[in-house]
Amino acid sequence: MKTSRLPIAIQQAVMRRLREKLAQANLKLGRNYPEPKLSYTQRGTSAGTAWLESYEIRLNPVLLLENSEAFIEEVVPHELAHLLVWKHFGRVAPHGKEWKWMMESVLGVPARRTHQFELQSVRRNTFPYRCKCQEHQLTVRRHNRVVRGEAVYRCVHCGEQLVAK
Protein backbone atom coordinates (compact mmCIF):
# COMPACT_ATOMS: atom_id res chain seq x y z
CA MET A 1 0.00 0.00 0.00
CA LYS A 2 1.40 3.39 -0.95
CA THR A 3 1.27 6.43 1.31
CA SER A 4 -1.19 8.11 -1.07
CA ARG A 5 -3.82 5.46 -0.21
CA LEU A 6 -3.59 6.26 3.48
CA PRO A 7 -6.17 8.96 4.29
CA ILE A 8 -4.59 12.35 4.85
CA ALA A 9 -6.44 12.68 8.18
CA ILE A 10 -4.66 9.57 9.49
CA GLN A 11 -1.27 10.79 8.24
CA GLN A 12 -1.91 14.13 9.97
CA ALA A 13 -2.88 12.38 13.21
CA VAL A 14 0.35 10.35 13.07
CA MET A 15 2.43 13.52 12.53
CA ARG A 16 0.59 15.32 15.36
CA ARG A 17 1.32 12.47 17.78
CA LEU A 18 4.95 12.23 16.65
CA ARG A 19 5.53 15.97 17.04
CA GLU A 20 3.68 16.10 20.37
CA LYS A 21 5.77 13.28 21.87
CA LEU A 22 9.02 14.63 20.39
CA ALA A 23 8.35 18.07 21.89
CA GLN A 24 7.52 16.46 25.24
CA ALA A 25 10.78 14.47 25.16
CA ASN A 26 12.88 17.48 24.14
CA LEU A 27 11.38 19.50 26.99
CA LYS A 28 11.90 16.79 29.63
CA LEU A 29 15.40 15.91 28.41
CA GLY A 30 16.51 19.50 27.79
CA ARG A 31 17.49 18.62 24.24
CA ASN A 32 16.49 19.56 20.72
CA TYR A 33 16.33 16.23 18.92
CA PRO A 34 15.23 16.59 15.29
CA GLU A 35 12.04 15.20 13.82
CA PRO A 36 12.69 11.75 12.33
CA LYS A 37 11.83 10.83 8.77
CA LEU A 38 8.50 9.01 8.61
CA SER A 39 7.40 6.50 5.97
CA TYR A 40 4.58 4.03 5.55
CA THR A 41 6.61 1.20 4.05
CA GLN A 42 6.67 -1.41 6.84
CA ARG A 43 5.27 -4.74 5.68
CA GLY A 44 4.31 -8.01 7.29
CA THR A 45 3.19 -8.37 10.89
CA SER A 46 5.42 -5.66 12.38
CA ALA A 47 3.50 -2.51 13.25
CA GLY A 48 6.60 -0.40 12.83
CA THR A 49 10.38 -0.24 12.95
CA ALA A 50 12.88 2.40 13.99
CA TRP A 51 15.93 2.69 11.75
CA LEU A 52 18.65 4.19 13.91
CA GLU A 53 21.32 5.13 11.38
CA SER A 54 18.88 6.81 8.98
CA TYR A 55 16.83 8.23 11.90
CA GLU A 56 13.62 6.97 10.34
CA ILE A 57 10.36 5.44 11.51
CA ARG A 58 8.62 3.02 9.16
CA LEU A 59 4.98 2.27 9.88
CA ASN A 60 2.76 -0.51 8.56
CA PRO A 61 -0.04 1.22 6.61
CA VAL A 62 -2.38 -1.79 6.70
CA LEU A 63 -2.22 -2.18 10.49
CA LEU A 64 -2.45 1.61 10.88
CA LEU A 65 -5.67 1.74 8.83
CA GLU A 66 -7.23 -1.17 10.72
CA ASN A 67 -6.23 0.02 14.21
CA SER A 68 -5.83 3.79 13.82
CA GLU A 69 -6.48 4.99 17.36
CA ALA A 70 -4.46 2.37 19.25
CA PHE A 71 -1.72 2.45 16.60
CA ILE A 72 -1.27 6.22 16.85
CA GLU A 73 -1.41 6.16 20.66
CA GLU A 74 1.05 3.28 21.14
CA VAL A 75 3.13 2.42 18.06
CA VAL A 76 4.22 5.95 17.11
CA PRO A 77 5.68 6.69 20.60
CA HIS A 78 7.13 3.15 20.77
CA GLU A 79 9.21 3.68 17.62
CA LEU A 80 10.09 7.27 18.54
CA ALA A 81 11.38 5.99 21.89
CA HIS A 82 13.85 3.70 20.07
CA LEU A 83 15.28 6.68 18.17
CA LEU A 84 15.42 8.91 21.25
CA VAL A 85 17.14 6.19 23.29
CA TRP A 86 19.72 5.76 20.54
CA LYS A 87 20.36 9.54 20.41
CA HIS A 88 20.45 9.87 24.20
CA PHE A 89 22.28 6.70 25.31
CA GLY A 90 23.87 5.25 22.17
CA ARG A 91 23.48 1.58 21.29
CA VAL A 92 21.67 -0.31 24.06
CA ALA A 93 19.24 -3.25 24.29
CA PRO A 94 16.19 -2.57 22.08
CA HIS A 95 13.60 -2.93 24.85
CA GLY A 96 15.93 -2.52 27.80
CA LYS A 97 15.73 -0.31 30.87
CA GLU A 98 16.62 2.84 28.90
CA TRP A 99 13.78 2.26 26.42
CA LYS A 100 11.34 1.45 29.22
CA TRP A 101 12.36 4.65 31.04
CA MET A 102 11.98 6.69 27.85
CA MET A 103 8.50 5.27 27.22
CA GLU A 104 7.13 5.60 30.75
CA SER A 105 8.97 8.50 32.38
CA VAL A 106 9.64 10.74 29.40
CA LEU A 107 6.87 10.00 26.89
CA GLY A 108 4.24 8.94 29.43
CA VAL A 109 3.17 5.84 27.50
CA PRO A 110 2.98 2.25 28.84
CA ALA A 111 6.09 0.30 27.77
CA ARG A 112 4.74 -2.62 25.75
CA ARG A 113 7.13 -4.56 23.54
CA THR A 114 4.54 -6.01 21.17
CA HIS A 115 1.19 -4.99 19.75
CA GLN A 116 -2.04 -6.96 20.03
CA PHE A 117 -3.50 -6.09 16.62
CA GLU A 118 -5.40 -8.64 14.54
CA LEU A 119 -2.95 -9.90 11.89
CA GLN A 120 -5.21 -11.82 9.51
CA SER A 121 -5.05 -9.18 6.77
CA VAL A 122 -1.24 -8.96 6.79
CA ARG A 123 -0.37 -12.59 7.39
CA ARG A 124 0.90 -14.44 4.34
CA ASN A 125 0.00 -18.00 3.40
CA THR A 126 1.12 -20.57 5.92
CA PHE A 127 1.82 -24.28 5.69
CA PRO A 128 0.51 -26.84 8.20
CA TYR A 129 3.08 -28.90 10.14
CA ARG A 130 2.57 -31.39 12.96
CA CYS A 131 4.36 -32.65 16.02
CA LYS A 132 3.19 -35.01 18.82
CA CYS A 133 1.08 -32.43 20.59
CA GLN A 134 -0.37 -29.96 18.08
CA GLU A 135 -0.56 -28.47 14.61
CA HIS A 136 1.73 -25.55 13.69
CA GLN A 137 1.56 -23.01 10.86
CA LEU A 138 4.91 -22.24 9.23
CA THR A 139 5.43 -19.16 7.10
CA VAL A 140 6.35 -19.48 3.43
CA ARG A 141 9.95 -18.57 4.26
CA ARG A 142 10.29 -21.24 6.96
CA HIS A 143 8.51 -23.84 4.83
CA ASN A 144 10.91 -23.17 1.94
CA ARG A 145 13.90 -23.54 4.27
CA VAL A 146 12.60 -26.95 5.34
CA VAL A 147 12.03 -28.00 1.71
CA ARG A 148 15.58 -26.94 0.75
CA GLY A 149 17.01 -28.77 3.77
CA GLU A 150 18.36 -25.54 5.27
CA ALA A 151 16.40 -25.69 8.52
CA VAL A 152 14.65 -28.00 10.95
CA TYR A 153 11.98 -26.63 13.30
CA ARG A 154 10.93 -28.15 16.62
CA CYS A 155 7.89 -27.71 18.81
CA VAL A 156 8.59 -25.49 21.82
CA HIS A 157 6.27 -27.67 23.96
CA CYS A 158 7.21 -31.29 23.17
CA GLY A 159 10.55 -30.74 21.39
CA GLU A 160 9.62 -32.98 18.46
CA GLN A 161 10.69 -32.04 14.94
CA LEU A 162 7.87 -30.50 12.91
CA VAL A 163 6.73 -32.53 9.90
CA ALA A 164 4.67 -31.26 6.97
CA LYS A 165 1.09 -32.60 6.97
Curated annotation (Swiss-Prot):
Under InterPro entries, the record lists: SprT-like_domain (IPR006640), SprT_Zn_ribbon (IPR035240), Uncharacterised_SprT (IPR023483)
Q: One cellular component GO annotation, for this chain's record?
A: cytoplasm
Provide the residue positions that the database annotates as binding Zn(2+).
Answer: H78, H82
Q: SMART domains, alphabetically?
A: SprT
Main localization of the protein described in the UniProt heading: cytoplasm
What is this protein's name?
Answer: Protein SprT
NCBIfam families linked: PRK04860.1 (NF003421)
What the record notes about the co-factor is: Binds 1 zinc ion.
Keywords assigned: Cytoplasm, Metal-binding, Zinc
The entry's family comment says:
Belongs to the SprT family.
SprT-like domain location is 20-163
Q: Which Gene Ontology BP annotations are present?
A: response to stress
Residues that span the membrane, as ranges: none
